[in-house]
Amino acid sequence: MTQINNRSVWFVIGTQHLYGVETLRQVERHGQQVVDSLNRSGILPFRLQIRPLVKTPDEALALCREANYDSECYGIMTWLHTFSPAKMWIGGLSVLHKPLLQFHTQFNAEIPWDSMDMDFMNLNQTAHGGREFGFIGARMRLPHQVVTGHWQDERTLLRIGQWMRTAAALQAGRQLKVARFGDNMREVAVTEGDKVAAQIQFGYSVNGWGVGDLVEVINQVKDGDVNALVDEYESRYVFSAAAAVGGAKRQNVLDAARIELGIGRFLDDEGCRAFTTNFQTLHGMTQLPGLAVQRLMQQGYGFAGEGDWKTAALLHICKVMAGDLTGGTSFMEDYTYHFAPDNDLVLGSHMLEVCPSIASEARPLLDVQPLGIGGKADPARLIFAAKAGRAVNASVIDMGDRFRLLVNVLDAVEPPRALPKLPVARALWHAQPSLATASEAWILGGGAHHTVFSQALTVDDLRLYGEMLGIEVVVIDEQTTLHGLRDALRWNEAYYRLNQR
């Protein structure tokens, strides 16, 4: 596996001067060996960077302050090789704003039965040193994570990698700018929300631009750039007769390419990595952005329709979290049900905007078809079906006094029959634990009709993300019952009201 970028997680070993110079040298050597091994493993998405031993309160404070201001640092991973009195960490942990992982490991995998002496016991104290550090985390109510396991165990490294990706997603959210072209779809409730509260909680900023500002950039795109992009389309997609050279709708494909280039340039100029559109506010645009949005999502941009900035932001964050993992991640909407004995299904889609990262076809179909809403020219779009396999749907909603993240476990399936007259991309799935329970639980929890659909991420990924942020997480999976979910929602309501700051 290739590491994603040059950013890193700091590997910090806590100890104290009590043990003497030679013991501390051994700790340093062990730490370097562990870091080198983990970096060579091919499992971690980001590099571990070893830092000097932390032996005093001043060193702990200085380290945490430095981590906060280092934009290349995703978070801190601590290891208590020896006993590190936790009071010395209070100052540093009080100011730390980066994610914290306690790696509860030890240098030796097994007890050296024949050779273990008091020198060995003096050096290898993770088992109780980690508990001391863990107490101060609990006492300070720190939203931190703990991974236990030997540093040469692949299962342990996979969990560290999961934490790293989530830490990267957290930082991406804190740096994210979301552009809204137009406002929300009129009279829709769930796409509304407190953007100031969201920026305080998640870190991302949401601002609006008039569609005219975007149209001006689109109109400045040169024909040569459009033709070059259409050549790329030709190499990647199968064209319908209408969309092909000489086809009745060829100009619509050229217009879609111009829109893609214009939106991409606008977002890059403004530093935005997520955006929303609204089919009710398209003044000056030739067609509703379909193909353009699909391709921009595949490039990592977050998107949601009808002004839904929460889902657009969540999509970009999830794409960062998915990183190098297998499987795609897309904007999605539950569209229609298939009620059948022992085979209830949900068809998910949207008007046009489903990301081709989830496509089962190597070369999706590029077509131009009429669209009954928006009042514009027939839009270009990619048509495909999602791959079969385990997936999740996720939604962030504004509950007024807090944000709630809902996650439903799904099993995507291959369509049992063709859909020859449906000219949009789609996914078909079994909702866990059943369509009836999943939909009722989702509705009781207030989940949005827009979601992020991911075949790369799991419930554990999203739960970890919610825990890092300190937001409410509601999971609907194979174990969910309606009475249990109702109880959990009531308990959560009490907890978050009592825990308001």
UniProtKB/Swiss-Prot annotation:
InterPro entries: Ara_Isoase_C, AraA_central, AraA_N, AraA_N_sf, Fuc/Ara_isomerase_C, Fucose_isomerase_N/cen_sf, Lara_isomerase. Pathway: Carbohydrate degradation; L-arabinose degradation via L-ribulose; D-xylulose 5-phosphate from L-arabinose (bacterial route): step 1/3. Its cofactor is Mn(2+). GO terms for cellular component: cytosol. CDD domains: L-arabinose_isomerase. Its EC number is 5.3.1.4. Disulfide bonds: none annotated. Gene3D superfamilies: 3.40.50.10940. GO terms for biological process: L-arabinose catabolic process to xylulose 5-phosphate. It catalyses: beta-L-arabinopyranose = L-ribulose. It comes from the Bacteria. It holds the Pfam family AraA_central. Keywords: Arabinose catabolism, Carbohydrate metabolism, Isomerase, Manganese, Metal-binding. GO terms for molecular function: L-arabinose isomerase activity; manganese ion binding. Mn(2+) binds at residues 306, 333, 350, 450. Binds 1 Mn(2+) ion per subunit. Homohexamer. Belongs to the arabinose isomerase family. Catalyzes the conversion of L-arabinose to L-ribulose. NCBIfam families: PRK02929.1 (NF002795). PANTHER family: L-ARABINOSE ISOMERASE. This is L-arabinose isomerase. It comes from Erwinia tasmaniensis (strain DSM 17950 / CFBP 7177 / CIP 109463 / NCPPB 4357 / Et1/99). The gene is araA.
